Amino acid sequence: MVRLAAELLLLLGLLLLTLHITVLRGSGAADGPDAAAGNASQAQLQNNLNVGSDTTSETSFSLSKEAPREHLDHQAAHQPFPRPRFRQETGHPSLQRDFPRSFLLDLPNFPDLSKADINGQNPNIQVTIEVVDGPDSEADKDQHPENKPSWSVPSPDWRAWWQRSLSLARANSGDQDYKYDSTSDDSNFLNPPRGWDHTAPGHRTFETKDQPEYDSTDGEGDWSLWSVCSVTCGNGNQKRTRSCGYACTATESRTCDRPNCPGIEDTFRTAATEVSLLAGSEEFNATKLFEVDTDSCERWMSCKSEFLKKYMHKVMNDLPSCPCSYPTEVAYSTADIFDRIKRKDFRWKDASGPKEKLEIYKPTARYCIRSMLSLESTTLAAQHCCYGDNMQLITRGKGAGTPNLISTEFSAELHYKVDVLPWIICKGDWSRYNEARPPNNGQKCTESPSDEDYIKQFQEAREY
């Protein structure tokens, strides 16, 4: 009640003062008895206003559109516009002077105050301005009090942005799960089984939360996910990497078998049909061709059909040359090896597995490789190369590799009939077999074995 009474008294005093000044200006009698009495009344009202202002120093009121224009004109004309002091009213959060949204009132933007004189006395009136936050309300960031620092105080919007930034950073750089599959069957004699350094079977999930890129204890990080298979059909390979220390990255690869490429059977259908005549079919059986009293191996060697001549010519021109040393990359997966004679890359794969039976068909060989078919191939043949314990190419003798007229990649059955069965017919006499299927040494590698060992092997084959 005291506060309301003080405000009413203040408003009444201002109204009377305004009316009095208006009357004085209209009459023009500034030195008469009435003027003296008016001056006394004005002094009395001014004293009352000062008393009321002292007792209600914390009183504030809101400027509204309904305030009389004369009151605003008089206030602006005789009093300097005060620097705004902002208070927190009950239920209405008003901005304090220290907040980044505080601003100075721009008089030209207010029609009622545009002509105000701000050089008069200040009646010590406090003005509370309420600013409602909204998308269209922006603070004046260019004006700051003299004693304020150049940076602004964090606002709730800034805090929300910081939380969103932290969540995005965590999503991009941390808390990633890596699936590790240790049950894949892709190991061979040069590649230890996958997961040898992890004892838990099946799938494991590695969490990299709050860890550096690599483990400082053993110098190895977690394996990345396997890459996409390098081919969409046929035989390809996949790779994955992990950190092994500073400026060190370990790479691991494995084979991935996709469905056969469409069209390869159609591409080689004619050749497969013609070659099947040599292997045996309902119309022609190679084993029945030879009589009991004839040398079957000799008959096989002397069979020189026009198709076979043309086919062998294509084989010699189509197949790559054997590398002089065993390419160790084929032990892990199929590999592309550049052929300097053909001037292009050829895909190779390891052929040293148990099913190759090297101890029977290639007794002195330790490793063998076989070229792979491609859509550019004009035949179904594959180059077959074998290597000794020193990983050097065996160019002659019983351990040397010979071209396969039918690749096992196309048909294992036809390969057996065309390439393996003649060796059986010749009773393992590699000297005659290699005469019909000479080993490849297109890159002019060092002859192996030595002349002495080769002559010894040749004599043993003849005596057998």
UniProtKB/Swiss-Prot annotation:
InterPro entries the record matches: AMOP_dom, Angio_Inhib/Adhesion_GPCR, TSP1_rpt, TSP1_rpt_sf
GO cellular component, one term: extracellular region
Gene3D superfamilies referenced in this protein's UniProt entry, alphabetically: Thrombospondin type-1 (TSP1) repeat
Disulfide bonds: C229-C256, C233-C261, C244-C248
Signal peptide span: 1-29
Keywords: Disulfide bond, Glycoprotein, Secreted, Signal
PROSITE patterns: AMOP (PS50856), TSP1 (PS50092)
Subcellular compartments: Secreted
Domain of life (superkingdom): Eukaryota
Annotated GO biological process: negative regulation of angiogenesis
Biased composition (Polar residues): 51-63
Residues carrying covalently attached carbohydrate according to the record: N39
Principal place of residence: secreted
Keyword Protein biosynthesis applies: no
Annotated region (Disordered), positions in chain: 50-98, 135-155, 173-219
Entry annotated with the keyword Ion transport: no
Entry function: Acts as an angiogenesis inhibitor.
Subunit structure: Interacts with integrin ITGAV/ITGB5.
Domain notes: The C-terminal AMOP domain plays an important role in the anti-angiogenic function of ISM1.
Family classification: Belongs to the isthmin family.
Protein name in UniProt: Isthmin-1
Name of the coding gene: ISM1
